[in-house]
Each structure stands twice: as structure tokens, then as C-alpha cells.
Amino acid sequence: RTTLSTEEWLMSSIAEKIAASAPEVNRYLHFGLTSSDVLDTALALQLRDSTDLLIAGWTTVAARLKSLARKHEHSWMAGRTHGVHAEPITFGVKLAGWHAEALRNLERLERARELISFGKISGAVGAFTHFGTDYEAQVCKALDLTPEPVSTQIIPRDRHADYFHALVLSASAIERFALEIRHLQKTEVLEAEEPFSDDQKGSSAMPHKRNPVLCENLCGLSRLIRSYEHAVVENIGVWHERDISHSSVERVVLPDAVLLLDFMLHRFLRVLDGLAVDPARMKKNLESSKGLVYSQKVMLRLIDAGMGRGAAYELVQRSAMKTWKTG
């Protein structure tokens, strides 16, 4: 059993390969560098390129939401607050709100991509003891990265925490959309349903079930990504110019969160592509509250006619409560 750390084993393996294939340059391997020069700069490349995939995913989702919003601009439904009918809206307006949020997540990811695209070749404790800043600038330019303005032996982890927050907000947006679809798929509502294939089973015990399992899965994955953020923020604090307390955390949460968010974007796109919307049911549900959704309009008309606001509110509320009880 080896007693080498992963980092030591990797460097040893690379050294052996170079020694065998290019012995004349072997002595310059890792010359004047510290491991974090390689690892942190490589991590910046990984996160930058991964973010490009997430941006592409959100771009596709945003386009689909825009298309659906236009399709349902006249699909009237009950707007709900606290789960109770409030005033009429259209399903198109709801989707337009999702589209706007998708665009905000795109903007955040683009900023996060820029924020994380920093490298460092400043050596031990970031002191440039063996190389000058010009060498760091050359390496970063070749990699299309920006040199970290003032590094220690590592790139400061507030960058990674800021980057990660963009992932958290993206996941939370998908959860919000998926949660709404779950509510709309309730038997008592049944205004929209996620896709359900002909050979799919909703329950092992109850053959009639059509459970919103895709959207439930998305909500669960969002919780997982959010739970990682605490650890990422904890990584900001390290001892002096470097320790490795952040390393074990990042090896788990960074690749996991990026992969999960990419999966969530693809899964949500699948939900949108197969979303079954029932405008007739939306209209029926809207009408089920017997016109109570127009209570504010009635109250404002009474006020315009000269009645005091308090009296108008009381009159409409009294009538509304009677309608609630008697229909």
C-alpha cells in the first residue's frame, strides 16, 4: 500500500513519464514552482470551461421558456398567493417571469466565469522568489487567464465562494420552476404536468399514479448544491499563506456541483419539452372561486364612486366571505 498522497503520487508519475520521454528537460520539471501554481491554475481552467457548458444549458432553457411564454400568453389562470386564488394572470406571464430569471442566471454565470478565470505562477507563499511577474503574465496569457493580482501560495478562495454562489442561485431557480410545476400537477389543480411516458410507472402499489418525479428530483438536487455552499465559504479562511484544509472540500463539492447543475439543466429542458399544459382546466379553476378574484376591482370602483376605502373594503369583504360559504 502506498503512503504517498494523491498529489505526491501524481507528481511522481508525471516526473517518471517526462524522465523517460524527455530526459534532457527532466531537471526543469516543477522548477521554481509550488504545487498550487499548477493546481490552482488548472482548477481555474476546469471551472472556466465547465461554466461554458452551464451557460450553453441556460441559453437553451431560456429560449424554450420564451417560446412557451409566447405560446401561452392568452392561457388565463388563477394567480395564487399563500396557495389561495388572488387575481387572474396568464400562464404566459408566469413563464415570462421564469425566462427573466433564466437570463439573470446567465448574467451571473458569465460574471462568475470572468471572476474565476485567474491563474498564479508566483511560487511558494506567492513571493515570486524564483520568477518575476513577467513569467506569470506569459503563462496566464497563453492560457487565456488573468494573473491573480496578489496571491499567497494559493489563489484566494473568496473567488471560488463567489463563483459557487452563482451555481447555487442557478440550482435554486430550477427548483423554483420545478416546485411550481409540482403544485400545478396536484390532482385538485391539474393545470400542468411533467412528461410521463407510456411505459412509465408512477407507483409500485397504485397503478393510477402519475407522480412528478422529475421535478421532485430537481428540487432535491438543488438542496444538495445549496448544502455545499457552507463548506465553500468555510474554505475562505486558511492559515497564513496556505494550508490544505480547502483541498479536500473542493475535490468533492466543485466537480459535484458543476456536474449536478449541468444534469439539472438537461433534465429541466426535458420537462419543458414534454410539459402538458391544460388551458381549459386553468380556466375552470379560475372560475371555481365564483368571481372572487375580482374583489379588488369592485372595491376600487366603489371608491371611485365616492365610498370611503374602509367602508368599501368592509362591504366587499363581507360579500366575499358570504360567497366563500354559500357559493
Feature locations, PLM:
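Glycine-rich cofactor/substrate-binding loops
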Residues: 1, 206-327
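Short runs of predominantly hydrophobic/aromatic residues within well-ordered alpha helices
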Residues: 3, 7, 160-163, 295
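Amphipathic alpha-helix face/heptad-repeat signature
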Residues: 50, 54-61, 91-98, 105, ...
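Hydrophobic stripe of amphipathic alpha-helices that form coiled-coil interfaces
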Residues: 68, 72-75, 109-112, 116, ...
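Glycine-rich anion/phosphate-binding loop at the beta-strand->alpha-helix junction
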Residues: 105, 109, 153-247, 251
